[in-house]
Amino acid sequence: MTRLQQRLEEALANLPDALRTSLTPIINAEFKGVISKEQFQSLQADSELSDKELRLALLPLAAAFSVAPISNFYVGAIARGLTGNLYFGANMEYNDVQLGQTIHAEQSAISHAWIQGETGISDITINFSPCGHCRQFMNELTTADSLMVQLPERNEKSLQEYLPESFGPKDLGIEGGLLAPLSHNLALETDSPLLRKALEAANRSHAPYSHNLSGIALEMESGEVYYGMYAENAAFNPSLPPLQVALVHANMSREDILTVKSAALVEDHKGAISHLAITQSTLEALNPDVTLEYASL
């Protein structure tokens, strides 16, 4: 049994009997942190829990995906997409990498939903109050004005109540927002499957400020490939690089992120910044033998 599955089963064991019985077939060795709208409705009926109570009860399962070798502080988040599906996320840290590369649980859950094709988030449930960094990150979303935030033992509140007089994309003349469906039509002639997958990700990236349209693909020792696209933020610092989104993709797919063996990064040369140097250094900290292909379009 993997460490992740052990954590999931430990979390399951602490749930009310009716909920545990209904969840057990779902939380199997193939579970990748997604609960469909239909599954959620079935769990709610079986457990007789309210929508809020059920989401809060599921948080320990989301936190089981946490990778926190520095803080040993496990945070879970559950983002509900506009489809009604729920996406787990958890904080991620890396030894020997500067703390700015850390992924917060809210960023993880939202990235997970983005990877799965969601175009907006209706609500997010978190086991600890969102930090200012995450409040600003969420304010980039297409649904920032209507997004609701649920914490344990508190009433649900809007993001705008957590971030009064907020600064966001509209203040910089940007319409749309993070998770808006995009296709930038970047093109690259290559025989590399990894570069092609990174290009697909770059074409979905959100980079209205630096115009650094960028995406990455990671190949793991298992042979599986995971991708990520750049999620830029109006406040700049809360931006989430493509590598971090790809690492969320891998982690929520039950991969050990230390087993990345090769990567490919694609960027638009017209961008005002580059992810190349920080991507190289972070990958090398995960695996000193990793190889990185790079294309500047």
UniProtKB/Swiss-Prot annotation:
Q: Which residues are recorded as binding substrate?
A: 91-93
What the protein does comes down to: This enzyme scavenges exogenous and endogenous cytidine and 2'-deoxycytidine for UMP synthesis.
In this protein, the active site sits at: 106 (proton donor)
| Cofactor(s) listed | Zn(2+)
Q: What does the sequence similarity comment in the record state about its family?
A: Belongs to the cytidine and deoxycytidylate deaminase family.
What general EC class does the enzyme of this chain belong to? Answer: hydrolase
Name its species: Aliivibrio fischeri (strain MJ11) (Vibrio fischeri)
User: Does Nucleus show up as a keyword for this record?
Assistant: no
Tell me what this protein is called: Cytidine deaminase
Keywords attached to this entry: Hydrolase, Metal-binding, Zinc
Its EC number is: 3.5.4.5
